[in-house]
Each structure stands twice: as structure tokens, then as C-alpha cells.
Amino acid sequence: MTDTLIPNGCKSNGPVENGYFKKGCNPFAQTGRSKLQNKRAVLNQKIIKQMRMRAGAENLLKATSNNKVREQVVLELSYVNSDLQLLMEQLEGLNSSVEVYQNVQESSSIPLIPLGLKETKDVDFSVPLKDFILEHYSEDGSNFQNQIDDLMDLRQACRTPSRNNSGVDLIANYFSQLSFLETRFFSPTRQIGIFFTWYDSFTGMPVCQNNISLEKASMLFNMAALYSQIGTRADRQTLAGLEDAIAAFQKSARVLHFLKETFTHTPSYDMSPAMLSMLLRLMLAQAHECLFEQITLPGIRNEFFCLLKMAQEAAKVAETYAQVHQSMIETPITKNVPFFWTTMSQLKINHYNSLAHYFVSTALLDHQLNPSDDEDKQEKALSQLYDAMPEGRSPLDILKNKDERRRIGKAHLQRSIMGHEEAIRTHCRCRHLQKLDILSDILRASLNRSLTKFEQNDKEDEFTDYMLAPDIISKTEKKAEMEIPAATKVKVTDLFQRLGPLSVFSAKQRWTAPRTIRLILQDRDLGFTLKGDAPVQIQSLDPLCPAAAGGLKEGDYLVAVGDTDCKWMGVSDVMKLLKDVDEEGINIRVVSMMDSSSQPMATKSATYCGGLSKTYSMICLAHDEDDKNPKSRKVAKKPSFLSFGLKNKKSSSTLSLPNADYSRPWNRPSANYSNSHHESGLY
């Protein structure tokens, strides 16, 4: 999507400035990426409609005993299931449309796979937040209408982020605001009437919750998806572009890892632990592929040691994609992974393995062991290439015997040719792969190069002794690792900071209504002292002073002096306001903290229920854009996905989420974060 801006006087979509924020892309811009997102939104609505029809038909089938009605319902169910299948195939096609995300100047690089952004429905924060501000903070919610509008505009902008670091900063900004919002408005003792609806990016199934953790998890997924799109868009014909692509994919992997480790019970397939593990492997594999391209970009010298090194590097790329492919075909997620993705990973396994065999064959066929060469060094390099030497021969025998070098080199060429042919067959099996002309050209050029090499070394009168070339041990000098996103540099200001310091004025704390007390000095004495940071507390209260008689209590928080709000003032600033009090005195406002331990825990609302419908929210069946206010609906209460962590009493509960008010959580050092992409480190 082009980085067009919403015409509102904002020039870019960076951090908050002067109390406002910058915008995302123009949602009406008709670009390739925006068209795909619009199609995804339309498909999601069609899937909802078919799911409602199927749920209604299944309920009718259970309720009726009339055979004629049952036959009609069964027939209708078959139509609905057929329509659902078609819609799922269309959604899979959107996830397979990777060509619009590639760099327009790419002409010799294999396309990469980006993640699509999750779609969501609009959320109206206005009424619930104003009600909560009035009930909980005893302030007029209308005074915060501008801040609420800013929050809603910020969320709307995050639905169409620009495909660059500014778009990432925009999502990171909103994610931090969500942490502020959670602390200020989402109380464990009561439900707030805000429902978040998000659609699964692979199945299109909606999930609806009134838990802000679903919103935070979905924003992290979109941040990882945006990083993957940035990496896909990079110009891989330049070193700078390859560095950008590597960094973007590694940052995407880091965000996915944080999402997987933090939000452990998300009720949608695309954010399940198994799916996130696969996506994380995919991002690291693509980062490693870019590292390989970075090595090959200046050109590969036709030199013995260089060719063996490149063979092991190519084998390493194939190995990483083999791990990705294995995770794609595992039972929990294989039915939801696009066929394009599995075939693309299989194709890259064959392609890079074939490249590895081609490099080894070139090293053996084009070079001979000369007296001036370092014999020990070549012997060591060749011995490290295989687990077991071909036909039990020693490395030195192969290096010194010209015929043996030629025979083993041709065997590697044969494996290279077979691998390239298999890659082309894999390419022909998937209609979405067939649309990628660049990929087809690369595969055929690689095959022709191996065939030409084989013809140059094939003699008509030569007796062909067929042998199978051994596998090549993978090895790399540069390893793809998860990288901390640069979005940690975004400075965020709490939109609702006027409510007071978060450490005191939060949703989990309860106070009395503000009390107005007339403060009159006696012999220039207040009758009490102040302590603490903002807001200050009353201490050492003289029970005989006029303030105590007016209702002031020990431990009260001073929130206003006269018409001046002093929630954010320290002791020295408040004393400056009180030192000039005349004989008539001045009004002060105080609040007293109440014991909240006796408050009952709020019941979690339903999130999803059963079957293909295991990711489908029953709330979504009763709500849509054109429906009435959700408050008028009655929904059966069930534990949310976060309550599973409490039920099982696990130490790593999803309720213990990091607070992003000072720094991004994925930037914090943690023993749980491994920098290795090996299975033992990540999974």
C-alpha cells in the first residue's frame, strides 16, 4: 500500500506530538496491498454469514424430529459447508498472493512469504470509558472526549499502517496505549462494556472478547506481519536492501517469540503456540536465505575452498526450510497452512540442496590438486563436507585421483539436476506458484546451468558407473537470530494522564468520592504535614485542627487546591499553593483509598466454542456492524482464554503481562529469550 496519508494535517505516522498522533496509510488508496486487505475484510464477513447459517441449521437439526424438515436442513447444510469451503480457498488464495508484496525491481531473487495483517471491527470506546471515568474516578467523562477520540483514531490508523518503520512505530504506540488503558480502565472486579473482535488470518474465523489481552496479542501479530512485509519489500539486489530484509525478518521473529511466550491461550489458530512456532521458524529461515544472498551478491569465486564453503551455506538454507516444512505438515496446523506455503518451502529445500551439490561438483571437476596447493587444508575441507566419505575412500585419495574426482563430481551434478527437476515439478503443482514468472525463470536457469556442466564433463565413450552422491553437511558462518525491534525508541504519553499517576489512580484501586474541605490556618499552621510523591498524602494530622473537624483524615490523598489540580504535584509544589492562604482559608479536595480486597472477581465472558467452530466466538454470532448495542444482548458467561492460566494455577499465566508504559516488553532482558533458532533454543 502506498504511504498516502489521511488528509488531517498530519504528515507522517510517528509518535505522539503535542498531544496528538500521526496517521496511517489512506485506507481508500487502491494499491495491491490495500486491495488484498479489502478482499480479506469482505471474505471475513461472508464467512461470518455462512457460520451463522450453519449454526442455525445445526440447531434446527437438533430441535426437530420431522423427517421432511431434517432432509431440507441436511441439504441446506451441505450447501453452506460447500460455500464455506470455497470461501476458505479464496482466503488461502489471499495468503498465497505474495507477488504484490515483493520489491518491484526484483528480477533475480526467489520471492519471500509475508504475513497478512489481521482484520478487526471498529470499537467504540466513548460510552464505556466515559461511564467508567464517572463511576470510578468521579470525574466528568465528557472532559476526556478528545482523548477518547484520539485513542479511537489511533486504533483506526493501526488498521492501515504504512509499510515502513513509521508504520511499526504507529502500532507500537497503540500497543503502549493499550497497556496504559488496561491499567486505568480494566478492573479485575468488574466488566467494562468494550468488545474486541479479530479475525483469524488463516481461517477467517472471528474471535470476540471483552478482554484487552486479545487486542494486545493481535497488535503484536500485526507488528510481526508488518515487519515481514517490510522484509519482503526490501531490494535484495543491494547490500543495504539485504541488510534491511535480514533485520526485518529477525525483528518479526522476535515479536512472534514474545507473543508466543506471553499470550499462551489465545483463542485463534493463527496465534496458537504451534502456529506461532511455525511462523517464527519461517521468519528466521527467510532471514537466513537473505544472509546467503548477502554472501553471494558480490559473486562466488571459482576457487576450491570458496565453492565448498558456499555448498555448506546452501545446504544450511535447505536445512532451515526443511525444519519449516516439517512444522507446516504437523497435525495441529497443517490443515490451516496455505498449500502455497508448504510447496514453496519444499521447492526451496530442493533448490538450495541442488545448489549445494552443484558447488561441490564444480569444486571437484574444475580444480585439481597441484603441487603448490595446501594438501592438508584441502583434505580437511573435504573431510568436513560429508558424514561419511563416498564408498569409504579417504579424502586424500579422492583429491589425488583425477578419475575419482570426476566420478564423484558427476554424481553431485546428477543430484543437482534431479533436485532442480523436482523443484520445477513442485512449482508446477501449485497454481499460485505458477503465477511467479521470476521463480520459474530462476529454477529453469539453475537446471540449465547444471545440465550444461554435466554435458561438458560427459564423454560418449565413457562407461557410466552410477553412484549416489552423499549428503552435504550444512554449515554457516552467519546465523539468523531474533533481533530486538527498533520500535523501543518511540516515546509514548498516556492519553489519560490527567486522571493522575498510574501507581495510584488505576482500575484496581478504589476511593471515596472527592470531598471538599475548607482549610483555615491557625497561627500559620496547617494542622498536618504532607508526604510522598505525586499525589501527596496527609500525615501527622492534628485531630483538633479545623481541617480535621471538616472531615480530613490521616492518609487522605490531596487532589486539588482551590481550582488547581494537584494530582501530579509533589510536596514542594503543593506547599507553594498553600503558603499564601489568607485568613478566610481555601478549599481543598481529597480522596480516601478504600479496601478493595472484599470485591468479587468479575466473571469472564465467553470467547469461542466448539468445532471448526472451535475458534468461532458465540458473541460474534449475535453481533455485527449493523447490530444493536452489545449491552442489550445477553451472552452466556464462560471462562475466557486468559482464565485457563488461573484455573491450572500455572506460574506463566497470561494474566502476568508486562507493562509497556516505560519501554517495549520485547526489549527487556529475559532468560526465556534465546538468541538461537535451533529447536532446543526456541521450542
From Swiss-Prot:
Q: Does the keyword Coiled coil apply?
A: yes
What are the UniProt keywords, alphabetically? Coiled coil, Cytoplasm
- Ranges where the PDZ domain occurs: 515-593
Q: Which Pfam families match?
A: BRO1, HR1, PDZ
User: Domain BRO1 spans what residues?
Assistant: 111-460
**Predominant cellular place of this UniProt entry's protein:** cytoplasm
Q: Name the segments for region: Disordered.
A: 649-683
Query: Its GO biological process terms?
Result: negative regulation of stress fiber assembly; signal transduction
One cellular component (GO) term of this entry: cytoplasm
Quaternary structure, from the entry: Interacts with RhoA.
Job description of the protein? Binds specifically to GTP-Rho.
According to UniProt, the name of this protein is: Rhophilin-2
- Taxonomic lineage per UniProt? Eukaryota, Metazoa, Chordata, Craniata, Vertebrata
The coding gene here is: rhpn2
